[in-house]
């Protein structure tokens, strides 16, 4: 595997890119090849996939509490990516004067759905 397999370790998007997942550290997990592609891995086992997604959602909900609002700069800083990276993904997210409710931030980072 190109750049995804170092000593048998695979980087896995918890919310798959095909599901609207983005590239930020919390959405990435390192798994062995067996953990990644085996029968108990997230690609073959829906329960394991949901377990990882719910864990990520919980972490994001702590970073972005539902009743608070956040601007793109804060979102970018908390997730360790550039403002420009997130601006394009948050264009259609409901906001008031550039302030995004925590629930909407988490929902977008989870690919548009909650688990």
Residue ranges and their predicted role:
Residues 1-10, 32-35:
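Short cysteine-rich loop/turn motifs with clustered Cys
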Residues 15-28:
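Short linker/helix segments within small regulatory modules
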Residues 28-51:
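Short Cys/His-centered divalent metal-binding micro-motifs
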Residues 52-70:
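Short, amphipathic alpha-helical "recognition" segments used to contact nucleic acids or chromatin
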Residues 74-76:
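Short alpha-helical "recognition helix" segments of helix-turn-helix
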Residues 86-87:
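Helix-turn-helix DNA-binding helix
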Residues 91-115:
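Short Lys/Arg-enriched helix C-cap and helix-to-coil transition segments
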